[in-house]
Amino acid sequence: MSVNTKNWQELKKPTQLDVKESSDKARKATFIAEPLERGYGLTLGNALRRVLLASLQGAAITSIKIENVLHEFSSLAGVREDVTDIVLNVKQIALKMEGEGPKRLQLSATGPAEVKAGDIAVSGDIEVMNKDLVICHLDEGATLNMELTADIGSGYVPAVQNRPADAPIGLIPVDSLYSPIRQVSYKVEKARVGQELDFDKLSLTIETDGTVTPEDAVAYAARILQDQLTLFVHFEDGIPQPQSAMIGVAAEPQQDDANQLNRYLLKKVDELELSVRSANCLKNDNIIYIGDLVQKTEAEMLRTPNFGRKSLNEIKEVLSSMGLRLGMDIPGWPPENIEEMAKKLEQELLG
């Protein structure tokens, strides 16, 4: 099949993603992409916003059980808030949770006290992000013993769906807002390329609850869109595919592409002529071959100590020039005899 690659190769694309961090950079940031073809700012901005708000997974409280309380319309002696108010406060707890759920958490307090989210007893794989959130107030002599259930999910789940069929008496289901995203907005402006002003500039502002950074959030959203759109591409566009990289004997028509891709993957990263900062970051992260590098995602790279957005853009540009990118899946990597393969392939290409 003849594929007109000009359909996408000749479109204007941003060469890098600029990030404007707020005072609380772990929770809020603005991402600026330019230049984009006319109309693409709205297309990408709206798609990313919808995915960010609806599809990212997070942790939330799904139910609570309070000692000596039968239902949410009860009250506790010595507790200033009604159980209904306590439930409303519990819904605002922001959790960062590793592994699978559900998991049980305990909260015990004796008055007089101001009970906060930070008083919840958690295990090593759960972290309360908003520890100063006030849950209730206890008077002198009052006690509070509460069991909270946390789980992982996406979107919004009403309390009625969080009640199991075999729920014990006293279990109070809670509305769960799993999304780690608190707010997303975008703005599209005109961008200049040379003397032309017929391009878009997209500014995407993301605010999270602190359980995920804005950089990771936008990367997850873009990856979701990428994964969903792959279904619609029914042809190969001539870019070397990673699946053929580790094939020992490729079919004759594909031999050149396989050798070319193998040559890149088996090349060491210290041959890429990167800046000293980028090269040191890769070395410290034990990334030796390009095959090691391309399997890393952008989010993983940004978590590398001293590795910033400037280094990321530098590496992406170098990989792009070779028809490669971050986040590739290479079955069988690394091969057991990687050093021997690298030397042999280099000799074949030179010979």
From Swiss-Prot:
MF terms in GO: DNA binding; DNA-directed RNA polymerase activity; protein dimerization activity
Protein EC: 2.7.7.6
Domain of life where this protein originates: Bacteria
GO biological process, one term: DNA-templated transcription
Enzyme class: transferase
Keywords: DNA-directed RNA polymerase, Nucleotidyltransferase, Transcription, Transferase
Residue ranges, annotated region (Alpha C-terminal domain (alpha-CTD)): 256-351
Catalysis performed (reactions): RNA(n) + a ribonucleoside 5'-triphosphate = RNA(n+1) + diphosphate
Any one cellular-component term (Gene Ontology): DNA-directed RNA polymerase complex
Region (Alpha N-terminal domain (alpha-NTD)): 1-236
Pfam families in the cross-refs: RNA_pol_A_bac (PF01000), RNA_pol_A_CTD (PF03118), RNA_pol_L (PF01193)
Job description of the protein: DNA-dependent RNA polymerase catalyzes the transcription of DNA into RNA using the four ribonucleoside triphosphates as substrates.
NCBIfam families: PRK05182.1-2 (NF003513), PRK05182.2-5 (NF003519), rpoA (TIGR02027)
Swiss-Prot/TrEMBL domain comment: The N-terminal domain is essential for RNAP assembly and basal transcription, whereas the C-terminal domain is involved in interaction with transcriptional regulators and with upstream promoter elements.
Family: Belongs to the RNA polymerase alpha chain family.
Subunit structure: Homodimer. The RNAP catalytic core consists of 2 alpha, 1 beta, 1 beta' and 1 omega subunit. When a sigma factor is associated with the core the holoenzyme is formed, which can initiate transcription.
Protein name as catalogued: DNA-directed RNA polymerase subunit alpha
Source species: Erythrobacter litoralis (strain HTCC2594)
Encoding gene, per UniProt annotation: rpoA
